Amino acid sequence: VRLLVSPSRESISWDLAETLAQRDLPACLRLFRQLMFQKEKPFLLLMGIEARIRDMLALRELIEAGHLRLSYSGSYVNPAWSELPEAREAAQSLVGHLLKGHPFRLAMLAKAASGFTTVELQRWYRRTVETHARLTEGAVPDDLLMECLLVELIQGGRHAAV
C-alpha cells in the first residue's frame, strides 16, 4: 500500500513522531533521511514532533491523575475516562482537540504516553523547544540539528555534539 499511496503531510509527521515515540532509532533515522531526500522541511517536522510530545505529556498527566485509564485487548488499547466532573474538565482543557478527533488516534497517543514518565516527556519537550530556537538561528544546518535531536531523545539524554 505504501508504494501505491502518496502520504499526506500529516501522516508524514505522524509516522516520524511514531517511530520516535517507539524509541526505534534506526527506523526514525531512516524515515527522517527519506523525508529530507523528499525535501520536507525540518522546521515543519519539528513542529509535528513538538505537538506530539505535548499531547503525550498531557495524556501522561491525565493517566497519573487517574482521569484516564488504559485497558489492553491484545495489541489494542482502550482508553477509559473517569466519570468525575474534574476528570472531564481536565481532559477538555488539556486534550480537548484530541477528544474531537478519531478515537484511534487518542488511543495510540495514550498508549505511547504510557511508555514514558512525565519527567521524560518534559525533558523531550524542553529539548524540542530548544532545538526549535536553534533552527531559527541558522548557525547549524536544520537537518543536522534535527538528526542530533532524534538521536539524543531516543538514546536517553546523551547529548549529540553540534
Please provide the spans of the model-predicted regions.
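Long, charge-dense, solvent-exposed interaction surfaces that engage phosphate-rich ligands
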Residues: 1-11, 19
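C-terminal alpha-helical interaction modules of replication/initiation AAA+ assemblies
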Residues: 12-15, 19, 27-162
